[in-house]
Amino acid sequence: MSLESFKRSIELGRQGFNQGFSMGLPKLEELIGGITKSTMTLLFASSGQGKSSCVLYSYIYAPLKEHLEDNKLRIIFFALEMKEDFIIAKLLSTYLYDTYHIVVTAKQILSIGKDYILPDDLYEYVQLGYDWLEKVYKVLTIYEGSFNSDKLIKVTMEELKKEGEFTENKYIPKDPEKVILSVTDHVGLIQPSNGRNRKGEIDDYTNKLVIIRNKTGLSPIIVMQSNRAVANMERKKNEAFMEPMVEDIKETSTVSENSEIILAVYNPQVDKRTTYRGYQVKEMGYRFRSILVLKSRYGENQVADCCFFDGAVNKWMEMPKPEEIFDYSRYRATNNSSIDNIIKNEDKDEKVKSKLDYSL
């Protein structure tokens, strides 16, 4: 890089080209810079802790909410685990809650369940979301099914060609300000090919993504499942080390080495913990999640963003500091949604209310 190139980078930053997009979680945005161009992110968790839900909320729903119609966002989603219909239903569930304050789960939207059919009153709300979804489909493209490294890279390149031109030495985007995300959920389901085992396939895929990232400004988000079984008994003796660590990443370490940002989703109640970093998590009825920043090349490492998580509508909200919480009852689940319980109880304690900002 020449001095002139460096000076240009500074000028582009002053023009706002390096500003991150919203993730719906202000503290996390401050820690990692939000969603930025040319940044590879690894997000992992053990099974059932909410890794896919976190990605759907912070890397898809939140930026869609902010950039749905300005043509500054493009999302390519490789769904190796979930079906496209269920992904869209989860996004719609969050949208309906944010817009109409109505709780309709993804399973309800799709009438999933024994003898369950979506009732007319909820169906009317679902129909109100169709116009929003029509706009979503213009920004978000979902590919579901079985993929190997070569197929994932081929589709990624085809999508990038729609957004710019590849020359012999560089990539010329149609809009330099546009952020293009590729989400792979989860990469552990990638299919081995060409004589490679699964580790080799993941390594091949992520190594090629690094090259594409450097050339095009693509921001890959890689979702992985961790292997908590690697934690030995010595680690279990110290509760601080019960949190996920980079060493827990399943299959391969190459992904972590290639990533600028590594996040881990953790539910301390899975480890039978009643308290966590000062929070009375047992009082929250399985609604507490910690998003751990294990690696960030542009900010702090080894810090936690402690969140309230309502799986019914896939809503994530950052918690106040533990010393600012005087009543945990508001965080418990109700018959509809635990978020409703937060709102209903906000007027009970003005001292607490003044310190809470859920941005609903």
Q: Can you say where each PLM-predicted feature lies in the sequence?
A:
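The Walker A/P-loop phosphate-binding site
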Residues: 1-100, 128-130, 356-360
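Flexible beta-alpha connector loops of hexameric P-loop NTPases
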Residues: 17, 141, 191-203, 234-243
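Structural motif
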Residues: 42, 180-185, 221, 263
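Helical hairpin unit composed of two closely spaced alpha helices linked by a short loop
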Residues: 76, 172-212
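Structural recognition of the conserved hydrophobic beta-strand(s) that form the central parallel beta-sheet
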Residues: 77, 183-184, 218-225
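Signature of the SF2 helicase/ATPase Hel1-core->accessory helical subdomain module
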Residues: 189, 225-230
